[in-house]
Amino acid sequence: NLTAYDTALGWRYPNPHMKEMYGTDQMGETAENIAEMKPHITRELQDAFALRSHQRAIAAIDSGRFAEEIVPVSIPQRKGDPKIVDTDERPRRDTSMEGLAKLRPAFKKEGGTVTAGNSSGLNDGAAAVLLVSADKGRALGLTPMARVVASAVAGVPPRIMGLGPVGATRKALERAGLKLEDIGLVELNEAFAIQAL
């Protein structure tokens, strides 16, 4: 006896016992849960953060900052030449505060603050990192780009899953004997502006 949902969001195979214990909020709903917990982070603040992210991404793309990080992918077409995808398609050049303000809440119709504009899109991508020991790196003649000094995991209630990195970051910094101010560059997965803020 199986219940299944055809969806890109949320649970495909809901477990009624898990639903009783934790709820079955989809990711966008968990972002709205965070917004309810943090009412001082307004829709306008979320939109401003999202706008800045789009602007920074476009500036980085235009300056070639990702040129060595993105491998072009060739996609055969039924007719004509293959389509070459070599640029992140998510950042929008025409994003503005006025445009973002016009978007309706996507996950909570009444009083919601999370929209398609201050959320990440549903798009495909992939990433790879080669991790080796210092000895193996030397043996292969590799020049390291980074060194792992600490790692950590942290759990949070599923209904606010987007806050998990906060506790994990604090634990990793403590293990490394570092403070956030000691870090020169932070790469943040901005699934939702509310989560990042």
Annotate each language-model stretch with its function.
Residues M18-Q26, K38-L51, P91, G111-A127, ...:
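Active-site pocket-shaping loop/turn-to-helix segments
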Residues E44-A139:
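N-terminal extracellular/periplasmic Venus flytrap/periplasmic-binding protein-like
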Residues E29-N33, R52-A59, G99-K102, A168-K171, ...:
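Alpha-helical scaffold segments in soluble metabolic enzymes
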Residues N1-I34:
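Flexible glycine-/small-residue-enriched beta->alpha junction loops
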Residues I34-H40, G137-G141, R170-L185:
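Phosphate/pyrophosphate-binding loops at sites that engage ATP/ADP/AMP, CoA/4′-phosphopantetheine
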Residues N1-D6, I70-T87, R159-I160, L180-L197:
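Conserved beta-ketoacyl condensing-enzyme motif
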